[in-house]
Structure formats: structure tokens, C-alpha cells
Amino acid sequence: MMPFYPVGSADLDVPPNLIGRGTGVCVSAYTHTEEGYDIEEMEAQWAQTYRLINKIRHNKDQLARYETLGLEDAEVVAVAYGANARTVKTGVLEARRRGVRAGFVRLITLWPFPDELFARDVPYVVCELNYDGQLVREVMRSAPDGKKVRFMGKSAELNTVAEVAAGLEGVARTGRIPELPYIWTEVR
């Protein structure tokens, strides 16, 4: 049987693609040997997982996808992903129209996380479609001062443009998100 990648190869980053006509490859979720047989031994599981994790880490720049706006002069940066990102971006544009130097980061992929986007020492406002704050923890971990990261969580509906603009304006002026109905600002 043809191995999944050269046996004993030091280059374990990208095994050749064997899927296609005439290859006889069975695709499954099980960890497998170099020959393609399912295994349960921890050492082989670890080696396979290690290879995949390192493959992602070494190619982080190609895999992490995001969109940015106005980061060059930003005094406060809004962060969002998914369905919420569109209204947050419009809220950033509204805040800029009001004189707040607001920036925007839309994460398209969440892993690998683009830590380098959060290297600036400015407040970050993470707008999420939940009350728990899942993404905010990653931003807190990546930012130089996690205490400058603010959370605007909302459940059952998207943040409105007015809420985002008011939140960014509040953080830029006072360091706090103003009291807004249905907005959760504590990370639990």
C-alpha cells in the first residue's frame, strides 16, 4: 500500500495529496499510521496532532483572514466577527463621522488568531452576539494591556449602528462604554 507521506520523512508538514481516482484512500476521522491504517496508540496520536498543529502555526500568515479599517490613526478599535461585523463596521464609520478616530477589525477566521493585529496600546471594544464574551478573552490575551479591552455583548439581536458608535465614543472619551439597554459589558 502506498504511504500517506514518505515514510521516515523529516518533512512532515505537508503530506502529498492522495485523494482522487485510483488511489484507494479511505478518509476517516481516525488517527492513522503512515500507511493509512487506523491506530489508537497515544504516541501516534500525539505525532499526528503535533504535525497538524505545527502545520497551522507555520502557515498562520496564510490562514488567518481578517479585514481592517482605519487602524493607522485609531484611538479606539472595534472588533467583531460573523453577522455582527457589518453593523459594527457601519458603527465605526458613524463614530468617525462624529470625530472619533475609530478603527475596525473584522475577523473572518478565528483560528489561528491574528495576535499581531492587537499589538497597539489602544482600547479595544469587542462586539459579540452573546452575553458571555468568547472572543473578548482572545483579544485580552493578545492586547498589550488586557485591561483596555471592553466588551459589548448582546443576545438575540445584532448591535445597532447607534449602539456601536455610542460605545466607541464613550470609550474614546471616558474609557467606559455608556449604559445602553440590553448591552452586557462584563466578561464572566
Q: Predicted segment positions?
A:
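Flexible, low-complexity linker and terminal segments
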Residues: M1-R188
